[in-house]
Amino acid sequence: APPPVGDQAGGRKVDCFKYNTTGSEFACSRKWQPVCGTDHRTYSNECMFCMLTQNKRFPVRILQDNKCDIECPQYSDMCTMDYLPLCGSDGKNYSNKCLFCNAVLRSRGALFLAKHGQCQSP
């Protein structure tokens, strides 16, 4: 996976004022130029990212200029025991996507995918 663009820990901040021309409504195009937010959701373009994240309880930044490697649509109370390990940016191994996504959501976007598979052991 390509490294995230911008500050490793927090992603890239976007100046959303350039898309919010009227003060209350965004004028977004349908152009497909995907970006991945620190909430691990893919947005169709930077303008849509701004429109859909403006009212989040915590600030969302752009993790990378492309689709997300792992999509984390929502928190899950129950995770399966499937073993498909993912290595988090915190150096911890997560047994599967569900456990990784729950950690991402708890971290409020601070955690991102370092790589598929286990982290290197010391």
Swiss-Prot record:
Which Gene Ontology cellular component annotation is one that this UniProt entry carries?
Answer: extracellular region
Q: Which cysteines are joined by disulfide bonds?
A: C16-C50, C28-C47, C36-C68, C72-C101, C79-C98, C87-C119
Question: What keywords are assigned to this protein?
Answer: Disulfide bond, Protease inhibitor, Repeat, Secreted, Serine protease inhibitor
A Pfam match is Kazal_1
CDD domains on file? KAZAL_FS (cd00104)
Enumerate the GO terms in the molecular function aspect: serine-type endopeptidase inhibitor activity
Q: What does this gene product do? A: This inhibitor is composed of two homologous actively inhibiting halves: one which inhibits trypsin, the other which inhibits elastase.
Q: What protein is this chain from?
A: Double-headed protease inhibitor, submandibular gland
* UniProt organism field: Mustela lutreola
